[in-house]
């Protein structure tokens, strides 16, 4: 695992992520400020120090995939996409939940905002899909690049997911556990 030490810049950026999230919900007049504020440290740390991604090529095959299972916490991801240079602006954050033409709807929508890997909303959907993404990645690597040394294939990307207890409760734990031990997920 990569060694990590938080810097003063990281601390300031995390505080800014919290303020931007709370402000966007306040401007919208509705939404969920608690999750984006509490998830700001982990989301910032993942996006800035661990997740392999390229804002100039959001569909790069070798990128890691990040799924925010609890779609109601979408500001968590929007703020990180803004910080990372995916083309979101402060005005986009101010227009959170701003209607049909917003780039920052109440739940992440695949195809609408660059950097969003999938639409999430119902609890458990993102968590279960992340497991599907991991199976797909493993299958794709085995099919298209089985001889490459570990870590050297574009198909060696990671699947990152943030989920809560509601997501886990919504998915059959026993079913997932059976597959997890078979596939080393």
Residues covered by each model-derived region:
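Thiamine diphosphate
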Residues: 1-160
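Residues at alpha-helix caps and immediate loop-helix transition turns in enzyme cores, especially N-
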Residues: 77, 172-173
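Acidic-residue sensor for enzyme active/binding pockets
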Residues: 117, 169, 180
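Short acidic, Gly/Ser-rich segments with clustered Asp/Glu that frequently serve as metal-coordination loops
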Residues: 166-172
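Cationic, low-complexity basic patches in intrinsically disordered or flexible, solvent-exposed regions
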Residues: 184
